[in-house]
């Protein structure tokens, strides 16, 4: 083998690392040193030349290309792509989301109830304020019935009770929702009325037939009708009888039965009389508090008692001025009496029989004579009271008097005033 033979060694490497030229030179020198003895003893004429160093291709599944420009810049690497890099990039992004284990189940904000059951007024697909309330989506529910829309009351052509208009802003729908849930309608709390104080003015006008009671006294004023020409006034300064009130004159057409008001346990009855117009031996007595009316089958009279004198140290003056009512329906007998009752334990009745004055003409409403009857000194007080009590009883038991008392004539067309005739002197002597 001549010295002209030359051997070329080719180093094949398949790594990604850069080839170190120093290592290659040293390795080539070592290999040439080993091969020199062989060249000296061999006659072979084979020549080995190292033409170029070829590196292995890079697998795409282990290396991600940054860009197409980077692949073109690498002269040593030749990469063949099996698919479109853009699609690969989208697939990779989807795979990355799956690797994070994040599952989107809903959305937040104004349309949070779009994918979940919701009442009609919260629907995101059909806005409650801008669309018809009759429309609904797959997730809409009735706010009142709490069932999937439409409910039986969804749209029944009555706008006030259609459940499609229900919302959580009005009180009526809240009450109906509570009624469907519990079975009873909630009631509103009742408000208590505020107490108010009514103040009556002090200066008030007294109405007709109204009785005014003054403190520490008993005063009664009765206003008679306009046809009566006189006033009936009674004053009694008794402090404990403020509750007593004199009754006004009853209607003459409605009086039928005899009423005698007395209470023997609390007071003693005193007959107030007026003696006038005596004819012959008889004495005519007119009673102020007795109104006698006679019809075709009955007659009635009313006698009002005096007030109760509890304290004997007080003085009572009773003055009565009464006149006869003109008319054809009734006869009203008037009386004027002056009684002075004084004493501390005993009462004195003074009757003056000597002052009896017979009237020359019949009494009328305009012409009335008065007389004062004083008890004679020989007559006892108890006897007089007994006689008066018997007279009361007789009047009450005999509504249609006969005998000494002349019955009243039937009412006629003419105006008249008749009297009750009674023998008072004979009655006292009995």
Curated annotation (Swiss-Prot):
Q: Where is this region: Disordered?
A: 1-21
Q: Which GO terms describe its cellular component?
A: nucleus
Has keyword Ion transport? no
Q: Where in the cell is it found?
A: Nucleus
Chief site of localization: nucleus
The effect of disrupting this gene, in the record's words, is: Normal hypersensitive response (HR) but impaired ability to suppress bacterial growth upon infection by the necrotrophic bacterial pathogens Pseudomonas syringae pv. tomato DC3000 harboring type III effector protein AvrRpm1 or AvrB.
Identify the InterPro entries for this entry: RPM1_Interactor
Residue ranges of the region described as Nuclear localization: 231-300
The task this protein performs is described as: Resistance protein interactor which positively enhances RPM1-mediated resistance to necrotrophic bacterial pathogens Pseudomonas syringae pv. tomato DC3000 harboring type III effector protein AvrRpm1 or AvrB, but prevents the hypersensitive response (HR) controlled by RPM1. Together with ARF1, promotes leaf senescence and cell death, probably by facilitating the translocation of ARF1 into the nucleus, and activates ROS-related enzymes (e.g. POD, CAT and SOD).
UniProt-recorded name of the protein: RPM1 interacting protein 13
Name the gene that codes for it.
RIN13
């Amino acid at each position: 083998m001549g010295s002209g033979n030359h051997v070329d060694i080719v180093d094949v490497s398949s790594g990604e690392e850069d080839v170190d030229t120093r290592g290659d030179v040293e390795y080539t020198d070592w290999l040439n040193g080993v091969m020199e003895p062989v060249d000296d003893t061999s006659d072979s004429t084979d020549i080995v030349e190292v033409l170029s160093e070829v590196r292995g291709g890079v697998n795409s599944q282990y290396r991600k290309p940054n860009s197409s420009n980077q692949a073109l810049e690498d002269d040593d690497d030749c990469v063949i792509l099996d698919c479109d890099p853009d699609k690969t990039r989208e697939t990779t992004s989807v795979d990355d989301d799956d690797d994070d284990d994040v599952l989107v189940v809903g959305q937040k904000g104004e349309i949070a109830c779009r994918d979940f059951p919701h009442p009609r007024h919260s629907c995101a697909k059909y806005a409650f304020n801008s669309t018809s309330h009759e429309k609904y989506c797959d997730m809409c529910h009735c706010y009142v019935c709490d069932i999937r829309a439409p409910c039986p009351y969804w749209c029944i052509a009555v706008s006030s009770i259609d459940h499609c208009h229900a919302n959580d802003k009005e009180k009526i729908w809240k009450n109906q929702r509570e009624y469907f849930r519990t079975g009873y309608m909630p009631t509103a709390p009742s408000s208590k009325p505020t107490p108010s104080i009514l103040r009556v003015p002090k200066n008030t006008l007294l109405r007709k037939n109204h009785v005014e009671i003054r403190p520490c006294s008993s005063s009664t004023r009765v206003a008679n009708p306009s046809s009566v020409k006189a006033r009936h006034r009674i004053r009694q300064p008794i402090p404990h009888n403020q509750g007593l009130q004199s009754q006004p004159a009853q209607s003459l057409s409605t009086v039928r039965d005899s009423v005698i008001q007395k209470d023997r346990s609390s007071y003693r009855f005193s007959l107030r009389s007026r003696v006038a117009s005596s004819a012959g031996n008889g004495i005519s007595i007119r009673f102020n508090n007795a109104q006698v009316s006679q019809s075709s089958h009955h007659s009635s009279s009313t006698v009002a008692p005096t007030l109760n004198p509890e304290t004997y140290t007080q003085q009572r003056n009773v003055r009565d001025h009464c006149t006869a009512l003109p008319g054809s329906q009734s006869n009203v007998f008037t009386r004027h009496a002056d009684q002075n009752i004084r004493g501390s334990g005993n009462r004195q009745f003074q009757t003056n029989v000597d002052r009896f004055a017979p009237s020359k003409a019949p009494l009328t409403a305009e012409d009335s004579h008065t007389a004062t009857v004083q008890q004679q000194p020989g007559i006892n007080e108890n006897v007089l009271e007994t006689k008066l009590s018997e007279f009361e009883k007789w009047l009450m038991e005999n509504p249609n008097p006969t005998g000494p008392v002349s019955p009243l004539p039937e009412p006629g067309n003419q105006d008249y005033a008749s009297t009750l005739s009674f023998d008072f002197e004979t009655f006292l002597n009995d």
